[in-house]
């Protein structure tokens, strides 16, 4: 469905690195020293937490990951660095701050119930020496990566100055910047590509109580305007992800079947979004991918990750609303032009036609066209333009039915109709990387070729055409009545 298994984008995660330390035990007595439980420890282990969990999710998706953060000069910091490096993470931008401990959260669990949490951390902002050292070294990796994730847990690393520097420099290089925000003042995230607040965080940041669709749209648009975001979205828990534009909301519904534990789901969402966007997906496809990844994760216990194989298996075993997905691929020209702003890193393939009676020749042609890039857009003649081109008896199938048939093909990403006799104006607006036409255009002028980077002609399968099918049906009728 997504075709991202072979992708391996370079992604930098800058944020608050943590260790989640779990202690499992039993309790059968009270301490004689004080009225408290005595825990007999049976097992304990360390897991990656905070921004490290984002890293873990990216590694599971086969991204090339760089991490920038601060650890203390302690055993926990050594373990964290060694663990990340063993996973293939580039830790060249991991800095040691002797004035602070490595953030470590210890959870004591008895009979599957958390009874105590102990935090070792410092929320003090990093000192100027560490700050300057980070800025000095970050230029090189910011130039190299496709995307930056800012994972802010409010532990002192991401002060206003450092956050502004990362966003401003990255945007000057046309890099994607995704932020998992913290607190109620989002001004330091101004200029980011997108933020991933949940509904409660969006309320806190905007001062808007979200109680219905209108207030949700107001909050989403407020975030977009105030933070000058390219894309505004709010994660909606069991309702999915809301994307906001032009005072409207588009909700990508959740894919979760069963929820066992929501721990780390937000980290999975931002990791999956960054992976998909960096790999050429548009925001709608990226949110769909993130929803599936999150559905896999919440079906597990504890902080977990989702691999490509798990995502594919989940899709194939879920009775999803296929009709809704198909219909979402049929879009207006206005919506398409908005989408194209988010597809700058994708190789766009465009073709067009009437596609009146879909047949094996069409399927072969469209599959070959899709293989030429990342996104295949099919321009579809409306009914009136077909009548002008083919005669008053055509089309056989209406525009709506033809569009649904095309959208039902896995190789087709978007279907957009046009009313003119040729798709010239549409091609001029899209400016595709690849313009595809049928092999019968060898001796014809390809309309709109001057607006495409490349023109590719694909031969049709001999003997397979809509005209042949119609003629065959007509001959059959004549024979039947003679």
Swiss-Prot record:
Show the Pfam families listed in the entry: CTP_transf_like, PfkB
- Assembly and binders: Homodimer.
**Reactions that this protein is recorded to catalyse:** D-glycero-beta-D-manno-heptose 7-phosphate + ATP = D-glycero-beta-D-manno-heptose 1,7-bisphosphate + ADP + H(+); D-glycero-beta-D-manno-heptose 1-phosphate + ATP + H(+) = ADP-D-glycero-beta-D-manno-heptose + diphosphate
Q: Where is this region: Cytidylyltransferase?
A: 350-482
Q: Which domain of life is it from?
A: Bacteria
Query: What InterPro entries does this protein's entry cite?
Result: Bifunc_HldE (IPR023030), Carboh/pur_kinase_PfkB_CS (IPR002173), Cyt_trans-like (IPR004821), PfkB_dom (IPR011611), RfaE_dom_I (IPR011913), RfaE_dom_II (IPR011914), Ribokinase-like (IPR029056), Rossmann-like_a/b/a_fold (IPR014729)
> What does UniProt list as this organism's lineage?
Bacteria, Pseudomonadati, Campylobacterota, Epsilonproteobacteria, Campylobacterales
Corresponding gene? hldE
The record's annotation in PANTHER family points to: BIFUNCTIONAL PROTEIN HLDE
SUPFAM superfamilies assigned: Nucleotidylyl transferase (SSF52374), Ribokinase-like (SSF53613)
Identify the residues that bind ATP.
Answer: 198-201
The UniProt keywords, alphabetically, are: ATP-binding, Carbohydrate metabolism, Kinase, Lipopolysaccharide biosynthesis, Multifunctional enzyme, Nucleotide-binding, Nucleotidyltransferase, Transferase
Q: Which family does it belong to?
A: In the N-terminal section; belongs to the carbohydrate kinase PfkB family.
Could you give a single Gene Ontology term from the biological process aspect? ADP-L-glycero-beta-D-manno-heptose biosynthetic process
Output this protein's name.
Bifunctional protein HldE
Q: Which residues form the active site?
A: 267
One GO term describing the cellular component? cytosol
Residues of the region (Ribokinase) are 1-322
Pathways per UniProt = Nucleotide-sugar biosynthesis; ADP-L-glycero-beta-D-manno-heptose biosynthesis; ADP-L-glycero-beta-D-manno-heptose from D-glycero-beta-D-manno-heptose 7-phosphate: step 1/4; Nucleotide-sugar biosynthesis; ADP-L-glycero-beta-D-manno-heptose biosynthesis; ADP-L-glycero-beta-D-manno-heptose from D-glycero-beta-D-manno-heptose 7-phosphate: step 3/4; Bacterial outer membrane biogenesis; LPS core biosynthesis
GO MF annotation list:
ATP binding; heptose 7-phosphate kinase activity; heptose-1-phosphate adenylyltransferase activity; phosphotransferase activity, alcohol group as acceptor
UniProt-listed Enzyme Commission number(s): 2.7.1.167, 2.7.7.70
């Amino acid at each position: 469905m997504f075709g991202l298994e072979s992708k391996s984008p370079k992604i930098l995660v800058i944020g608050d690195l943590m260790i989640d330390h779990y202690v499992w035990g039993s309790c059968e007595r009270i301490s004689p020293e004080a009225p408290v439980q005595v825990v007999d420890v049976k097992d304990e282990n360390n897991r990656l937490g905070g921004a490290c969990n984002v890293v873990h999710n990216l590694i599971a998706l086969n991204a090339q990951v760089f991490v920038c953060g601060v650890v203390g000069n302690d055993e926990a910091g050594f373990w964290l660095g060694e663990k990340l490096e063993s996973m293939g993470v580039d830790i060249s931008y991991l800095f040691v701050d002797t004035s602070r401990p490595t953030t470590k959260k210890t959870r004591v669990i008895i009979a599957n119930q958390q009874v105590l949490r102990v935090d070792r951390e410092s929320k003090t902002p990093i000192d100027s020496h560490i700050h300057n050292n980070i800025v000095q070294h970050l230029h090189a990796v910011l130039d190299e990566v496709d995307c930056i994730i800012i994972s802010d847990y409010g532990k002192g690393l991401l002060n206003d100055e450092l956050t502004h520097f990362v966003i401003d420099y990255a945007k000057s290089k046309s890099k994607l910047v995704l932020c998992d925000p913290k607190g109620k003042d989002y001004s330091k995230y101004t200029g980011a590509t997108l933020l991933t607040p949940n509904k409660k965080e969006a309320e806190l940041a905007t001062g808007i109580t979200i109680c219905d669709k209108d207030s949700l749209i107001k909050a989403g648009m407020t975030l977009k305007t105030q933070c000058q975001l390219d894309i505004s979205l709010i994660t909606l828990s069991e309702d999915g992800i809301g994307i906001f534009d032009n005072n409207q909301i588009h909700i990508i519904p959740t894919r979760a079947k069963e929820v066992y534990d929501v721990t780390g789901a937000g980290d999975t969402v931002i990791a999956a979004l960054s992976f998909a966007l960096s790999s050429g997906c548009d925001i709608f496809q990226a949110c769909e991918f993130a929803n599936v990844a999150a559905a896999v994760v919440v079906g597990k216990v504890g902080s977990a990750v989702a691999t490509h194989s798990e995502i594919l298996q989940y899709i194939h075993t879920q009775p999803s609303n296929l009709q809704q997905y198909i219909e979402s691929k049929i879009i207006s020209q206005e919506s398409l032009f908005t989408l194209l702003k988010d597809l700058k890193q994708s190789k766009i393939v465009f073709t067009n036609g009437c596609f009146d009676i879909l047949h094996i020749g069409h399927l072969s042609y469209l599959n070959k066209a899709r293989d030429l890039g990342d996104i295949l857009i099919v321009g579809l003649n409306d009914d009136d333009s077909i009548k002008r081109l083919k005669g008053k008896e055509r089309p056989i199938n209406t525009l709506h039915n033809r569009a649904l048939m095309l959208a039902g093909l896995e190789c087709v990403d978007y279907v957009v109709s046009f009313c003119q006799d040729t798709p010239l104006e549409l091609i001029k607006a899209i400016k595709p990387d690849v313009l595809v036409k049928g092999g019968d255009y060898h001796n014809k002028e390809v309309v709109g070729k001057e607006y495409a980077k490349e023109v590719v002609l694909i031969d049709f399968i001999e003997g397979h055409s809509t005209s042949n099918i119609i003629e065959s049906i007509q001959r059959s009728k004549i024979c039947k009545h003679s």
